[in-house]
Amino acid sequence: MKRSYPDDLVIGNLSRRGFLKGVGATGVLLVAANWGWRDALAAEKKAFGADAMPHGWVDNPKIYVSIDRDGTVGIVCNRSEMGQGVRTSLAMVVADELEADWSRVKVIQAPGDEARYGNQDTDGSRSMRHWFEPMRRCGAAARQMLEQAAANQWKVPLGECRAEQNKVLHAPSGRSLSFGELAEAAAGLEVPARDKLLLKKPEQFRYIGKDVARAIDGADIVNGRAGFGFDARFDDMLYAVVARPPVYGGKLKRYDAAAALKVPGVVKVIEIEGRPIPSEFQPLGGVAVVAQNTWAAIKGREALVVEWDAGVNGGYDSVAYRKQLEEAARKPGKVVRDSGDAAALFARGGDIVEAEYYLPHLAQAPMEPPVSTAWYKDGACEVWAPTQAPQVTRERIAERLKLPFDKVTVNVTLLGGGFGRKSKPDFVLEAAILAKAFPGRHLRVQWTREDDLHFSYFHTVSVERLQAVLGADELPQAWLHRSVAPSITALFGPDSKHQGAFELGMGLTNLPFAIPNVRLENPEAPAHTRVGWFRSVSNIPHAFAIQSFVGELAAKAGQDPKDYLLKLLGPARRIDTAELGDSWNYGESPERYPLDVGRLRGVIEEAARQSGWGGELPRGRARGIAAHYSFVTYVAVVIEVEVKDDGALLVHKATIAADCGPQINPERIRSQLEGACVMGLGLAALGEISFKDGKVQQDNFHQYELARMPLAPKAVSVHLLKPDGDLPLGGVGEPGVPPIAPALCNAIFAATGKRIRELPIRNQLQGWRKA
């Protein structure tokens, strides 16, 4: 069987015993971190971080380090790479503690197997904060084993041996041995006990924290050798596209495949059974056209005659639904936080300010649409997919095909963007289901851009209504916020009409303002389409509404927006988020990860200073500021804009300040924040998915527009605050998105006097001078 695919992205479905045996036969060093995590944590009342994740640590994280005889250092990455640099950053950590020569490092992608690799969900901006320490320990353990092997061979004290750049040196004699020469002997040694590990001090780091551009896959991506989902190619390939019900919950009534089967290259037409609401991560169902090439499959689908039953969501209309959300926002809802007595102050009246904000559904729209290749034979299934959740994918395939778990192999390719869409494996299941109909042949299911936009797990639509009772100092004495949005939890329960704790904890319940009376409510909002994870999730609507409202209050008070925001935050202090009603805190310990107002103030001050806040600007330009805490990271943004007479929006500069704790790979951190800025601008200015008769109205990028060069900032500067003291790692992939929209809209107000309360902005600036 001929295969065109990078070997380092494929691992065979070996048992642990088989893998170890194979490694021993080739004489390489293999290290598995194994220190009985459950025993160590047994006394804790509640687990946090990776320990709280499904299979987060199990009994052995099984993060492997291997060294070949030629000195090549193999590092297994258990997280999915989608441009955030995790394959590079995790490898950097191991290589640093190991003292590996970076030019000799090879990264091997782990297949979906949580029992071996621990939790593999690549979401929540938590890969580095959950795996930094385990990877350090693995690197350190391997280093000490190599040093011990050298000491044994030279018959010298261990303390005289020191690993450095793929060698172990014996300073007194000047002798050295390469890692490759020591690998076989080191492999026979016991892994050092956890309390015997000698981790490097920060000043000894060679790669960690160094501001050097490294990208383990960079050259391959540039020259086309990198393996994305589309690059899994075999000589016996079949290709399929699927006609899916255009309305969520719809069903197939009838179809006629006669014309489709006449299309040259079409092999077969197969019905896929969908799952009734709630669909969870299952395929929507429909009719698949299988062909000898993608084009034939697409033309065959066009020739299908299909009749659908729209079902309960056939009347879903974005315009009408917005009105429902607005009506709900004007009535009391489920109370999710009630500090002081806000109700009494609002009943008393006085200087009350209110505003309402709207955000539509959004689609992740990764540049690489969903795609998956599957192979089925003799009761076993193997897939190649750009998935963010390989273990969930494996579980769902086993369930759907009624296979033993160990008969399913999920190979993780590079992802051409993910943004949360590829954490749902419906597209991989489609390939597995269809491959079973063609035993022994590889079958790829390809989604078109239209498929991607029509059948995504969309970011929620939202109405946010805020009110404040102002005191004599123009600061809020009482605060009321009603957040109305369908929840991701509706994927799992049909009657779910309130946001989950994890959604509420994304900028709503953990509001850090020093306001004595706060009431937060979450009215009902039923879901009429698939709502799913999206880069930064519910932080987007919460940050947009709250930071825009702060801008409005500052303008009413006639005060500088930055100074007003700092007054609202109050003095530097550390808040236990549970005291605010946030029971989630991004899954982290409130003791280790308190909401630190001082750090939030710090990024605001830094962004303002670096942007030249308060300084003069050319005529027609203005600045806006916003700040937000998400994924245990603090980000502030200043946007400098110009609005032309015809309403054209120019973003001259974006200044970003972030405090994410220790910085493992500063270059990748900056690149993610830069990318978040461009994405956030595109969402704010252009992003909207709308529905009519239950169907998505946008087909491609001419209707669902992304940020293009004219909208991108002429300059983006990212400033990373150095951690003060022993701070834990924060997230990076998502925190840069939420403050972008409010900073942009606050800047637009400063430039034009026009307040933007609904997104996208699109044509709202046309005729602003006349207004």
Residue ranges and their predicted role:
Residues 43-89, 93, 120, 217-220, ...:
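Conserved beta-alpha junction segments in alpha/beta enzyme cores
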Residues 1-14:
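N-terminal secretory signal peptides
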Residues 14-35, 564:
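N-terminal export leaders
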Residues 2-3, 132-212, 264-350, 414, ...:
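Molybdopterin (Moco) oxidoreductase catalytic core of the xanthine/aldehyde oxidoreductase family
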Residues 95-122, 144-176, 261-263, 400-409, ...:
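C-terminal catalytic domains of large/alpha subunits in multi-subunit enzymes
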Residues 238-246:
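Short glycine-/aliphatic-rich beta-strand segments at the starts of folded cytosolic domains
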Residues 87-92, 395, 418-438, 445:
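Thiamine diphosphate
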Residues 114-117, 126-131, 182-231, 333-372, ...:
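Glycine-rich loop/linker segments at domain edges
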